[in-house]
Amino acid sequence: MLFKSTYNEFIKIAAKPRSYLGLVAITVLVGVILFALKADGMSFISFVTASFEQTLSFEGNILNGNLVAFIVLQMLVIHIPLLVALVTGDLVSGEGAMGTIRMLAAKPISRSTLLMSKFLAGAVYTLLIVIWLGIMAVVVGKWMFGPGDLMVLNSDGLVILQDADINWRYVGGFAVAFLALLTVSSLSICLSCFSDNSIGPIVITMAIIILFTIIGTLDVTIFDNIRPYLFTTHMASWRSYFEDPLPVVDIYKSVIILLVHNVVLITVALVKFNKKDITS
């Protein structure tokens, strides 16, 4: 019953034109970035490496597919939550506004199963967004620029990762990025259970992300105790896979915190949805 309901919910997502906005946006944005780097990427690389050229000598294909994919992820991962929230934010409230939620509740399926199918459908859509971003960034990037060692600039200095040691890092990085975006999906669906307006949950989701991001970036002592537990703090944890040595403890911590957020949001949504008056 859950599988069939999830399939039906995903069909509803696929039937909405806005669902393809994310795929189109990723295609266009990544395409523009790839074209710009192909046309004048070495100028950008020279600007970044200018401070190291006096002490280091760079040889080989610096502007390669691995570096291009990393640049794309840096630019786009923080913007993808909006594309996810646009679709998942009205999975409950949208049907409430149209009145179709009453018809669904009349079927021989529990409210909990119905809501979980919406969470699963939202997770599948989020996964497709992440996979498409990976194809455009990594696969197309390597096709256009070729393979090569990855040069990463972080707080500790310059890290150079061998080409043979990179693919598994991208897999792990995208997995953490998916978990972070899944938290956004769970948040928007949870908020959707509290509203009959399709726009409200989407706007509130983005407002929460902006607020938490500001709290996370402000170097104020009062926020030190809560900053590590905000999900936005861990939305960039995919970068940890491109450090050497790999900060395993930090990655585990981020994964656990994101999972806890998802469990809490789903639990709150289930409680609210089971008590929600959908007869009026």
Task: Locate each region found by the language model.
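Aromatic- and glycine-rich beta-strand/loop motifs that create alpha-glucan
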Residues: 1-27
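Secretory targeting signals
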Residues: 27-89, 116-185, 189, 236-258
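Transmembrane helix segments
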Residues: 32-42, 195-230
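Transmembrane helix boundary and interhelical loop/hinge segments in multi-pass membrane proteins
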Residues: 85-105, 278
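Alpha-helix N-cap/helix-start motif at helix boundaries, enriched for small hydrophobics
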Residues: 112-116, 273
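Junction motif at the cytosolic side of a transmembrane helix
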Residues: 190, 194, 257-280
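Short hydrophobic, aromatic-rich alpha-helical segments embedded in or entering the lipid bilayer
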Residues: 223-243
